[in-house]
Amino acid sequence: MPKYIIERIIPASGALTSRSLQKIARISNDAVQQAGAGIQWVESFVTADKWYCIYIAIDENIIREHAAIGGFPVNAIHEVMAYVDPVSAEGDIKHP
């Protein structure tokens, strides 16, 4: 399945408490269960006003379904085309 990066604009995200982040993670886990086998939440990176979420999913539609179930915004969805890291300099380019 393809891997995606989802951008979510959520003002004041950086000020969320650990308890709030835990609650959001539970909501996301529940939404994944409801959306079905075609989606997996990998991880999310929280910045001051945005979230960057990594998902493996059959397509963008199920990502939007997950967001609707959980009440999360979806400002952009980008399919990952390749992975580049320090080892890539030696010719080891990874593709999902």
Enumerate the language-model features and the residues they cover:
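Acidic-residue sensor for enzyme active/binding pockets
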Residues: 7, 43, 79
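Amphipathic, hydrophobic secondary-structure cores in small proteins
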Residues: 43-52, 63
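An amphipathic, aromatic/His-enriched active-site/gating alpha helix that lines ligand/cofactor pockets
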Residues: 56-83
